[in-house]
């Protein structure tokens, strides 16, 4: 892989236009074959894959040669002469998967080359890989916005739309013909209802890696067209007229600019103030876009109309209205990556002292407030059978066959994962409850194993029961739950590279809700 990347870096122009010869590199299909076997071991036993021993690179090359000879027409991998190619039964899908994997490796190389210049200049790129790295950005930018546009990217796309997307990047016609053939072979996977269903079906078909690459290309195409437009909009800021309202001549000019102007300077000042410095801030998770805007409600509706036309005209997709919602940040909360966020209006007392007098004022500020969703966390623990739906702890009878250290380690690991991920929550009372819910099932499981009472288990193992926590982690817990203001600051970690299992469960639940059309 490093060799192909170096070759592409030396001559990116040639790499983009002549990718087809890479498909004949046996190293690529060796990688694809390893990917296929690794996923086969996860979904089915090796005894069921009797055709693995008959794998042939020459057969794969013949398949690709036939695709090239068809002059771009769609080829079915099962329409070969059985006497010539010996490609029968389940071997058809097997070699189809290998061709798809080979294309995936080639596309991954080109995608990494094209997107590498976006990472140049980031000296601390490792810290930006953390999921928590997005929260400080939201904490800094979102309180200054007043509207939030929540968008679900349309993803039920036609294979030809993906081919057209790749044509902007890859100008090698034979590679595009091969890609078109493979995409039509897996058309049912691409035309799934939602992304989670696509990943589920793709896992069964052992093409999850390949489809994730296609999805990344599709999302990158959306971002490459929308983000520059948002940047130009943010840079073209309106002029603030607040400092010039006392001038009569300037007021007359503004009166002609604003359509619904008022004779009262007070009313006019309020209207002009909302036109000051519009801005757009954007974050993404999977197929979900969050766009925070500062401007009028009419401006937000125009952006929603523009995005609807964008997907309809550029990708020939119809975006349903229920997949785009508009929320006012000061009145509504929103969820993202397992957190519940809201923008709260906070007041604090300031004493201003002048030369001859002093007075007290209470300015109002906006504060970004992340909260751990306690109720949904309890629902997830109930689903995993740590408690019932009301939060009453229950024991894990399936773990009674494990050793005491293994049981303690499992409960302790679950608690530390929850605490680590939700360390940025502004309210720690819900995490206290999570610890209580997990501590009692741990004691009940040990009591059931030793056939004793919970009181005996507590006397033996101590009241804490989570004995695997290191001193550094216990210090972090004490700081997180401290009552002083200086020690209750939110903590965002730079080592969280994967989503919490609860976040994935919550995401699936939200997708089921959002797929039911309703009027926003």
Curated annotation (Swiss-Prot):
Its main location: plastid. One of its GO terms (cellular component) is chloroplast. GO terms for biological process: mRNA processing; RNA splicing; tRNA processing. Disulfide bonds: none annotated. It comes from the Eukaryota. One of its GO terms (molecular function) is RNA binding. Belongs to the intron maturase 2 family. MatK subfamily. HAMAP family: MatK (MF_01390). This is Maturase K. It comes from Cycas taitungensis.
């Amino acid at each position: 892989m490093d060799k192909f990347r170096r070759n592409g870096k030396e001559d990116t122009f040639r790499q983009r236009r002549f990718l087809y010869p890479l498909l004949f590199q046996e190293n690529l299909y060796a990688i694809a074959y390893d990917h296929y076997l690794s996923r086969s071991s996860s979904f089915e036993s090796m005894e069921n894959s009797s055709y693995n021993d008959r794998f042939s690179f020459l057969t794969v090359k013949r398949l690709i040669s036939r695709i090239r000879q068809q002059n771009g027409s769609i080829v079915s991998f099962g329409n070969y002469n059985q006497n010539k190619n010996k490609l029968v039964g389940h071997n058809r899908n097997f070699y189809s998967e290998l061709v798809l994997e080979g294309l995936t490796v080639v596309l991954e190389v080109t995608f990494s080359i094209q997107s590498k210049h976006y990472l140049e200049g980031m000296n601390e790129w490792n810290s930006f890989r953390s999921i928590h790295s997005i929260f400080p950005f939201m904490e800094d930018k979102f309180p200054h916005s007043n509207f939030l546009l929540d968008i679900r990217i349309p993803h039920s796309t036609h294979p030809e739309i993906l081919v057209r997307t790749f044509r902007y990047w890859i100008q090698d016609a034979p590679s595009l013909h091969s890609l078109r053939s493979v995409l039509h072979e897996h058309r049912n996977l691409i035309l799934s209802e939602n992304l989670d269903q696509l990943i589920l079906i793709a896992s069964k078909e052992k093409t999850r890696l390949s489809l994730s690459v296609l999805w990344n290309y599709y999302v990158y195409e959306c971002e490459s067209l929308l983000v520059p437009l948002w940047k130009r909009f943010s840079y073209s800021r309106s002029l603030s007229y607040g400092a010039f309202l006392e001038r009569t001549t300037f007021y007359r000019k503004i009166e002609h600019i604003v359509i619904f102007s008022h004779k009262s300077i007070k009313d006019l000042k309020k209207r002009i103030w909302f036109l000051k410095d519009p801005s757009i801030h954007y974050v993404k998770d999977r197929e979900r876009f969050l766009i925070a805007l500062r401007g009028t409600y009419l401006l937000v509706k125009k952006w929603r109309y523009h995005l609807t036309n964008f997907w309809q005209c550029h990708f020939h997709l119809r975006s349903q209205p229920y997949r785009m919602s508009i929320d006012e940040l000061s009145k509504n909360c929103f969820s993202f990556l397992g957190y519940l966020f809201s923008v709260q209006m906070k007041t604090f007392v300031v004493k201003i002292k002048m030369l001859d007098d002093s007075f007290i004022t209470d300015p109002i500020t906006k504060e970004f407030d992340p909260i751990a969703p306690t109720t949904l966390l309890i629902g997830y623990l109930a689903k995993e059978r740590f408690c019932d739906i009301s939060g009453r702890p229950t024991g894990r009878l399936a773990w009674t066959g494990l050793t005491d250290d293994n049981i303690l380690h499992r409960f302790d690991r679950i608690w530390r994962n929850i605490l680590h991920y939700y360390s940025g929550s502004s309210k720690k009372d819900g995490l206290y409850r999570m610890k209580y819910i997990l501590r009692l099932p741990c004691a009940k499981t040990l009591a059931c194993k030793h056939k004793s009472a919970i009181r005996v288990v507590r006397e033996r193992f101590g009241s804490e029961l989570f004995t695997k926590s290191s001193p550094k982690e216990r210090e972090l817990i004490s700081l997180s739950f401290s009552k002083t203001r200086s020690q209750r600051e939110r903590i965002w970690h730079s080592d969280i590279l994967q989503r919490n299992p609860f976040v994935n469960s919550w995401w699936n639940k939200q997708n089921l809700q959002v797929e039911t059309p309703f009027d926003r």
